[in-house]
A protein has these predicted regions:
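Interfacial helix-start motif at the membrane-water boundary
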Residues: 45-53, 57
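Solvent-exposed, well-ordered loop and adjacent helix/strand elements within mature globular domains
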Residues: 18, 22-47
Length: 120
């Protein structure tokens, strides 16, 4: 195994964890603009709390190598839902960011599983 793979995997995972932790904060203490977006997409007023909890869980799971694949998988599911929501509502300007984070989550998932396999 490439010796830099665990370093790359960990670094990317921690950056992704930071994204999800900041996202959780932003969804827990939602701005008026984001609340309006959730309403326009048809979600109930409390749904941003569900998003915040899921993003918090993904962020925390990404920190430790043992739980990293679960965090990356959960993050990928959350971002797939966000991408699908924006695309189905033709809100294309908001579709790019969750799509990129979905891709990064899948890369972290693949890298973390490769590192885990190589360690065993």
């Amino acid at each position: 195994m490439n010796k830099s793979l665990p370093i790359i995997s960990t670094s990317l995972a921690w950056l992704l964890a930071a994204f999800f932790l900041f996202g959780a904060y932003g969804n827990a203490f939602i701005s008026e603009e984001n609340a309006a977006a959730y309403a326009a997409w048809g979600y109930p007023g409390w749904f941003h709390y569900i998003t915040a909890i899921l993003e918090l869980a993904a962020g925390l799971l990404l920190i430790r190598a043992a739980t990293r694949p679960y965090g990356a998988g959960l993050g990928a599911i959350v971002m797939a839902a966000a991408s699908l929501t924006t695309l189905l509502n033709a809100d294309y300007s908001h579709a790019v960011a969750p799509s990129i984070v979905l891709l990064v989550s899948l890369v972290v998932l693949g890298l973390s599983l490769a590192v885990r396999r190589a360690a065993n």
